[in-house]
Structure formats: C-alpha cells, structure tokens
Amino acid sequence: MIAATADSFEIEKAKLCRKIAELQAALNAKDQKLRELQLAADNLLAEGEVQLAPRDHYTELSNDDIARYSRQLILTDFGVSGQMKLKNSAVLIVGLGGLGCPAAQYLASAGCGNLGLVDYDEVEPSNLHRQTLHTVSRCGISKAESARIALLELNPHCRIICYSNLLNSFNAMQIIPAYDVILDCSDNVATRYLLNDACSILQKPLVSGSALKMDGQLTVYCYGENGPCYRCIYPVPPPPEAVTNCGDGGVLGAVTGTIGALQAMEAIKVIVGLGEVLAGRMLIFDGSSCQFRNIKIRGKRPNCHVCSSQPLITGLIDYELFCGMNANDKDNALQLLEPEQRINVLDYHKLATEKKSHLLLDVRPPAEFEICQLPDAVNVPLAQILDDSYVQRFAQQLESKEYPIFVVCRRGNDSQIAVQHMKTRFPDHSIRDLEDGMHAWTKLVDQNFPIY
Ligand SMILES: Nc1ncnc2c1ncn2[C@@H]1O[C@H](COP(=O)(O)OP(=O)(O)OP(=O)(O)O)[C@@H](O)[C@H]1O
Ligand SMILES: [Zn+2]
C-alpha cells in the first residue's frame, strides 16, 4: 500500500517536473519573442518609417477635388468644410483583410488625405473572396503594399503609408499618435485589447468591426467624454477555446464588406462631425435575415482598468500573455496526446494501401467533409464524438480489437480532442489520430489533395 502511494507520488512528481520544464520553455520562447519584437520596433524606427511625416495642411479644394468629390460636396451636411476636414485627416487601418479592404477603399475614394495601413501578412488565394483590394497577381506580396497599389489607382491624391509589420506593444505607441481615427479591422483578441488600450491612453476614437459566418458587429470605442472602451464592455478576455476565427468558422465576403463599409462611414462621421457617431451603442448585423439591430451598450465603467479616472493600466502590456492567445488568428498546434497515440500520415497511408482493416473517422463538420475526404473516411463531427452519440453507430468496430480506429481532421487539433475523449471510454482500444491532419496529407502523401 505504502509502496503504491510512493509510486503514485513519483509519477505525480515526474508529471510536475515535465510541466515545469514546459513552462520554462514557454517562458524562454516569450523572452526570445520579446527581444525580437523590440529589435523589430527599433529597426522600424531606424528606417524612419514609423512616423507619418508632418502633414500638409490644405485650406482649399482643387478643381480636381471639386470634380472628383462633387456628389458628396453637394450633400448639405457634408459640403466643402466636410471635404476639407477629410482632406486634412489621417486614418490608421489595422488589418487589410475582409474589413480593412472595403474600409480603406471607401476612405481613400471619399478623399481622406492620409491613410496608414498596418498588416504583417501576405496576400493568399483564400483571401480573395472577400479582401477586395487584393488580386491574383499580388498573391504573395504584403497586404499593406497590395492595398496601397489598389488605393492609389482609385485615388492618387491620397497619401498612403504602409507598415508591413505586426502592430505590437512597442510600435503601437509610435505609430498611433500621428493619426486622428483608428480602425480595428483585425481578427484576434490580443490585437483588440492592444488597440483599445493604446487608443484609450492616447485618446483616439477606435472604430471597431468584426464579422464571422453571416454576422457582423460594429461600434466606436473611446469616443468623447463618456464613450466606453472595449475593456469597459469586456473587462477580461474570453477563454481561447471560445474564440472562433474565419479560417475555422467561415465568413461570407459580403458580410465583411458591409461592416467594413460602415467602419469607413463612422470614421468619416467622426472626422467631419456628422450625424450621430455609433458610440455607447453596438450595431448587430444578422446577414441571414438581413436585420440590423442597434443595442445600447454600457457607458464608461467607473473602475475600468484603462479608461477610468484612476486607471491601473497606463502603458501597454503583453497582450498575447494577457489573452492567452497569439496576435493572429492562426490556430496553435495542440499537444494533447502522447506520441504513441498518434500516427503520421505516411505510416497511415502505407497501412491503408495494404488494406489493413481499420476505421477512419473524420471529425470535421459536414460542410468541410463535403469539400474533400480521405479514401474510406466516415464523417463523425467532433460534437458527436464528445456527446458519445457515435458509440452506437460503431458498436461492432469498438468491440473488436481487429478494428484499430484512426481519427483525422483538417490540421490535427480536433482529432486529438476526439482521441482523448474516446480513450476515456475505450482505454484498451487502439485509437490514434493522424498527426497534422489533412494538411500533412497534402504535404507528404498527395500534393493534388485540396488544401483549405
Ligand atoms: N496585430 C496585428 N498587426 C498587423 N496586422 C494584423 C494584426 N492582427 C491582425 N492583423 C491582420 O488583420 C487582418 C484580418 O483580416 P482577415 O481575418 O479578413 O484576414 P486573414 O487573417 O487573412 O483571414 P484568414 O483567417 O481567412 O486567413 C489580417 O490580414 C491580419 O494579418
Ligand atoms: Zn474602459
């Protein structure tokens, strides 16, 4: 009995030691990243690229301006003074993706004099269905540069500064002060908090948009005396597992187009002093029923950590650490299973080619299964694994040791969750997942297999 207890202590101790080693490694990686970010920010500053050069101040419209903007100049509430304000304004757009492209397009064409474009990413074919400034021929180049090319064709009078870098806690405070209005067109929680805190500290209106699947949201933070900030509404970040991105959940391009265009609209209203800015309210767009709802959101939180009269946060922090998520929407590779609970795609391919009896469960949603599947795969969405409703369907295979079970998904994360769950019910059955999922299949087994 005592020996057994000592053994279990030893096992527990070994586990804790492993955990400590993992945490130490994570800490070292963060330290390294911090050094890289600092270096990148220094380089950027050294290149003199960060500062928007002193803006020209215009006092009148040119003939070309009058001809170009005539249809908005004749608007009673807009007029010459509105156009002059736009011409002298500077707007920073963070993210030149689904939201940022239409927002930039409407701001440049309306005559916003100075646009800053921030995006660290490059154009990919899967962006083109909604990121309307980019083109097939510009795949592979910086999104900020690609957007600049398109925008200058639209309006050569617009001055455009590109920052083809990740906006982070070092460069944000150098870039943002030069701009009048900031547009959050990013796709991740860490960047939302970073932009919020920077805008709150620097007192810049932040036009925040988001879109997923068929739905979108829009509001303006940090606007005026009483306008709440993002932290007033969301004091703590959501748990990482509750966050879905466009790459996983999907999105319709016209939804991002709708919200992006409205972000441009709110920015123009802020600059020109037009209408009623969407602060303290949130627009909820349900694309499937085409309904726009405007809900009142709470005002400034008296104890908000960043925008209250006695803030706890007076400088930018490490937002990836704070949110437990990276400042991008790419999935982190999970490490849930032991190596013996996984099989690489080459070994699986060999076994399947030799026609060894087995069952291959594909745990992606049906819409994704319809796009492409591995030979003989059976679609059992992850939800059916987790609620155990698959058990009855595969009772025969689960009873027979002759049927090793393999689980596959798109990138090898959900498949691990599925195996971990199935193992709790069938600990003695051989159940393994395909490492790195179908992406690895395309890379290592069949380059003609579609990737998405
Ligand atoms: N901190 C940041 N600094 C600079 N750019 C950012 C930052 N966070 C997000 N972005 C950019 O914001 C954009 C968000 O747009 P969107 O989600 O439509 O594009 P995406 O990430 O290319 O899409 P997908 O998920 O389909 O690959 C991306 O281009 C992304 O690179
Ligand atoms: Zn606040």
From Swiss-Prot:
ATP binds at residues 98, 119, 126-130, 143, 187-188. GO terms for biological process: Mo-molybdopterin cofactor biosynthetic process; protein urmylation; tRNA wobble position uridine thiolation. Its cofactor is Zn(2+). It is found in: Cytoplasm, Cytosol. Its EC number is 2.7.7.80, 2.8.1.11. Pathway: tRNA modification; 5-methoxycarbonylmethyl-2-thiouridine-tRNA biosynthesis; Cofactor biosynthesis; molybdopterin biosynthesis. The keyword Metal-binding applies. Disulfide bonds: none annotated. Pfam families: Rhodanese (PF00581), ThiF (PF00899). One of its GO terms (cellular component) is cytosol. Plays a central role in 2-thiolation of mcm(5)S(2)U at tRNA wobble positions of cytosolic tRNA(Lys), tRNA(Glu) and tRNA(Gln). Also essential during biosynthesis of the molybdenum cofactor. Acts by mediating the C-terminal thiocarboxylation of sulfur carriers URM1 and MOCS2A. Its N-terminus first activates URM1 and MOCS2A as acyl-adenylates (-COAMP), then the persulfide sulfur on the catalytic cysteine is transferred to URM1 and MOCS2A to form thiocarboxylation (-COSH) of their C-terminus. NCBIfam families: PRK05690.1. This is Adenylyltransferase and sulfurtransferase MOCS3. It comes from Drosophila mojavensis.
